[in-house]
């Protein structure tokens, strides 16, 4: 069964800063008690891959233990999670959880992900997405984002190592939460803009990095910008001062900027670190900061990092046409 809704974008705009407890007209409904389907995977399987119409899924309150795959589609797909406040992740009522290790997934990062998204132009609202495999599993993703013009609004991503893979295309993360320990915002080719995101580090490592950008050449357009966000320890966790770095270069042309972001003293005074002693990958990196605040923004930074004279803009990263696919009601 396929249901289309052409007014979904209008629904998203009108729902901002309000509750979303009922499905918009025409949406496929997922509910633990029934709905159209009881699993998210079955609802996605019911979508048409060939229609150019917008297709919408609404997920009712509950915890769904499944691995979700949204394949490439011809038209836009919008997924809404039930929430008491569309403007934030704090009141989300839908959690998707799964636990699979890198080894059990055939040594594929992507195949460990709780939510694998390869749909261009997809919009995801108010979902908690967790990989609960933990420290023993090493790489274990919550999200694997592999397509252009993807937007995540009021979402909560939790894991330990490699929580969020922003791999290809232009991507937006806004009013969201990202938690992890090791390289937990990573990828190779995406241009990703993170705004008003609460980044939380967990206890456990003696030294670790938040980002690991894998841009490997001058011609690769990959860029991660964390804008107007916060960096701190996960609530209740005891993280020693200076344990974490803002990033390390997965490849030698890595590009990451933190700007206008508040940082607690969990961030090391060097700010940034090498990939490893034997493979530093620092000669061509762009590791920048602008107008950050808090104890974690202080100190003498690594020699390969820089203080920027001006902030980057969203058009610098996502292009001048970003308003054609981004839900601008969140700005």
Curated annotation (Swiss-Prot):
The keyword Signal applies. Residues 1-17 form the signal peptide. Keywords: Aspartyl esterase, Cell wall biogenesis/degradation, Hydrolase, Secreted, Signal. Substrate binds at residues 139, 248, 250. One of its GO terms (molecular function) is pectinesterase activity. The active site is at residues 162, 183. Its EC number is 3.1.1.11. It catalyses: [(1->4)-alpha-D-galacturonosyl methyl ester](n) + n H2O = [(1->4)-alpha-D-galacturonosyl](n) + n methanol + n H(+). It comes from the Eukaryota. GO terms for biological process: cell wall modification; pectin catabolic process. Pfam families: Pectinesterase. The keyword Acetylation does not apply. Its main location: secreted. Coiled coil: none annotated. PROSITE patterns: PECTINESTERASE_1 (PS00800), PECTINESTERASE_2 (PS00503). It is an enzyme of class 3 (hydrolase). The record marks 161 as: Transition state stabilizer. InterPro entries: Pectin_lyas_fold, Pectin_lyase_fold/virulence, Pectinesterase_Asp_AS, Pectinesterase_cat, Pectinesterase_Tyr_AS. Pathway: Glycan metabolism; pectin degradation; 2-dehydro-3-deoxy-D-gluconate from pectin: step 1/5. Belongs to the pectinesterase family. PANTHER family: ACYL-COA THIOESTER HYDROLASE YBHC-RELATED, PECTINESTERASE. Involved in maceration and soft-rotting of plant tissue. This is Pectinesterase. It comes from Aspergillus aculeatus.
């Amino acid at each position: 069964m396929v249901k289309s809704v052409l007014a979904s974008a209008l629904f998203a705009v009108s729902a901002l800063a309000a509750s979303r407890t009922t499905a918009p007209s025409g949406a496929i409904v997922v509910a633990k008690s029934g709905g159209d389907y009881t699993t998210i995977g079955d609802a996605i399987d019911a979508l048409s891959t060939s229609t150019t119409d917008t297709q919408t899924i609404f997920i009712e309150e509950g915890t769904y233990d499944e691995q979700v795959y949204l394949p490439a589609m011809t038209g836009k797909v919008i997924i809404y999670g039930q929430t008491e406040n569309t403007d934030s992740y704090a009141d989300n009522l839908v959690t998707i959880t799964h636990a699979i290790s890198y080894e059990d997934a055939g040594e594929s990062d992507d195949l460990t992900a709780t939510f694998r998204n390869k749909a261009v132009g997809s919009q995801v609202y108010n979902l908690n997405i967790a990989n609960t495999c933990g420290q023993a599993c090493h790489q274990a993703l919550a999200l694997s984002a592999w397509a252009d013009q993807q937007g995540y609004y009021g979402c909560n991503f939790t894991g330990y190592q490699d929580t969020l893979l922003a791999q290809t295309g232009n991507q937006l993360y806004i009013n969201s939460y990202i938690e992890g320990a090791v390289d937990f915002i990573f990828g190779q080719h995406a241009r990703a803009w993170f705004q008003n995101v609460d980044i939380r580090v967990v206890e456990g490592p003696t030294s670790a990095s938040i980002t690991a950008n894998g841009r490997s050449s001058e011609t690769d357009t990959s860029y991660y910008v964390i804008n107007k966000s916060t960096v701190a320890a996960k609530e209740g966790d005891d993280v020693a001062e200076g344990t974490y770095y803002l990033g390390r270069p997965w490849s030698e042309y890595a590009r990451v900027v933190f700007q206008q972001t508040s940082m607690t003293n969990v961030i090391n005074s060097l700010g940034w670190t090498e990939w490893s002693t034997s493979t530093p990958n620092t000669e061509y990196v762009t590791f920048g900061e602008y107008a950050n605040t808090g104890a974690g923004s202080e100190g003498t930074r690594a020699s390969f990092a820089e203080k920027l004279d001006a902030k980057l803009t969203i058009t610098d990263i996502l292009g001048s046409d970003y308003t054609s696919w981004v839900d601008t009601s969140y700005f």
